[in-house]
């Protein structure tokens, strides 16, 4: 009788120890979601034919500062039939939520145009339409592919690979 009680106590302590170690392992190996900062350089060719050339060469800096706010910096140049212009804008994000395991959705509160930006809004809006869900929301898939490397996907396709910093 005493022996079976001792064995039961040993099994209970072993099970408690295993659950404790599993919990500690789980908590220490979870990815830290916020803040999320990731940058990359991308080239977008949105030309529909040779007569209507629209290309962007931009550095993108995506920052989810907190669960409910962040921004996307777009710096570079836009090339159209009218020539080459400078693109320097910040897309401010609010009311964010993690809507699935790897998908974030934010409301676009405003697009801030720098004094150095010379790209017409009609050209910029074509790029914005390529990377956003609609003119008022940004929805991105953030898939980890390496220790600090992520692939960022938009509503239509993957957009770019970036390095988290």
Indicate where each model-derived feature is located.
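Hydrophobic membrane-insertion alpha-helices, especially the h-region
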Residues: 4-25
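Aromatic-capped interface at the extracytoplasmic side
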Residues: 22-36
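Tryptophan-anchored aromatic micro-motifs
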Residues: 32-53
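Short, hydrophobic/aromatic-rich segments at coil-to-beta transitions
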Residues: 33-39, 67-73, 103-105, 145-151
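Extended beta-sheet lipid-handling architectures
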Residues: 38-42, 55, 89-91, 99-101, ...
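Generic short beta-strand segments
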Residues: 39-46, 73-79, 108-113
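Extracytoplasmic/periplasmic/luminal assembly and interaction segments
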Residues: 47-99
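Non-cytosolic head/periplasmic domains of membrane-anchored proteins
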Residues: 95-165
């Amino acid at each position: 009788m005493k022996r079976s009680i001792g064995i039961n106590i040993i099994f209970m302590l072993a099970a408690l120890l295993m659950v404790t170690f599993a919990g500690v392992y789980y908590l220490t190996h979870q990815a830290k979601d916020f803040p999320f900062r990731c940058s990359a350089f991308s080239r977008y060719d949105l030309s529909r034919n040779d007569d209507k050339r629209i290309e962007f060469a931009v550095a993108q800096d995506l920052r989810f500062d907190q669960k409910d706010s962040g921004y996307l910096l777009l710096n570079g140049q836009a090339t159209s039939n009218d020539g080459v212009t400078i693109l320097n804008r910040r897309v401010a994000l609010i009311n964010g939520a993690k809507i699935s395991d790897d998908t974030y959705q934010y409301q676009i509160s405003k697009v801030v145009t720098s004094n150095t930006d010379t790209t017409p809004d009609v050209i910029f809006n074509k790029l914005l339409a390529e990377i956003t869900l609609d003119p008022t929301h940004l929805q991105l898939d953030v898939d980890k592919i390496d220790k600090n490397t992520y692939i960022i996907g938009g509503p239509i396709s993957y957009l770019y690979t970036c390095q988290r910093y």
